Amino acid sequence: MQADELKGIDLSDLDELEKERLAMGQKAFKMIVYGFLGIIVVSGFLASLHLGNLFFFLLIGGVFYLGKTINGLKNELIAKFKQKVVSVIVKNYGLNFSANGGLSLNDFYKIYDADVNRHYAEDMIYGQIDETQFKLCDFYAAKETQGEKRTTTTVKFQGILLKAEFKKELNATIYVCDKKRTSDLRSDGELAMMDNPKFNELFKTYTTDQIAARYALTPKLMENLTTLRTKFNAPLSAVFLKNEIFIAIDLRKDSFEPDLKKPINSNESVQNYIAGVSDFVEIVRDLELNKNIWKS
């Protein structure tokens, strides 16, 4: 494997992580087999004591314990992966990574007007690109409803949330709403028809000032947002507020975790890790916030 040499990034810990992945799979398999055999033995014992009605509770408890233990092993390996792989790739771009860091719910609410009672943020990449300070992270937001028998979870958003700063300050608020999202997006102000037909096909634009919207959404920026929307093939919405832009890409997945069903150290996997980080870091560079949007 030539993972260490790919793009000059030192990923020499991948082979050790792959050994841990294989060991975890073997351990999980043994736990399932032994747990199943144990349940059979104990259920037979309970039946001999005429306590067969306890079998159901034993089964539920056993499944819960196995699931929790195996999930713990998985999370431990993922944490090591983020520390030894994702962090190294991010630092190669001259940026910083915090596995437990993230943007706030208030940042999420800059774009979304959703009823949320469960959320978390993780895997924050932050720093400066081309004079633009930014933060981006994996963000999850959902509404949990407690019913009589079970809890229903409605996922409102799961994807990348980005916050970046630019040098000029706007006197208006501008919302760029993906047309595939028919609800939960903020859309204050009046509808603004922009001069880019392709942009208008993908987005609805709302603003508190029509002139400011055309000042902020330059032809270059509209083209870049359209390109990003096509590239990720997922709902993308944004808001311009004072000297900040917030972007949400609803990918419906965690973006910085490995596929533990595949070898961690294969060249294909390594290329995917690098491309995964690169795709999101390049968002800031592609937008060219402090280069092409507003002239001094």
Language-model segments: residues:
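Cytosolic juxtamembrane N-terminal segments of multi-pass membrane proteins
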Residues: M1-F29
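Intrinsic disorder/low-complexity detector
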Residues: M1-G8, I32-G35, L49, W294-S296
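Juxtamembrane membrane-interface segments of multi-pass membrane proteins
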Residues: Q2-D13, I78-G94
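Transmembrane-cytosolic junction motif
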Residues: G25, G62-V88
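Transmembrane alpha-helical segments and their cytosolic interface motifs
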Residues: Q26-V41
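Core hydrophobic alpha-helical membrane-spanning segments
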Residues: L37-V41, I60-G62, F108
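Hydrophobic alpha-helical transmembrane segments
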Residues: F45-I60
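Charged, low-complexity intrinsically disordered regions
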Residues: S87, K91-K143, G147-S296
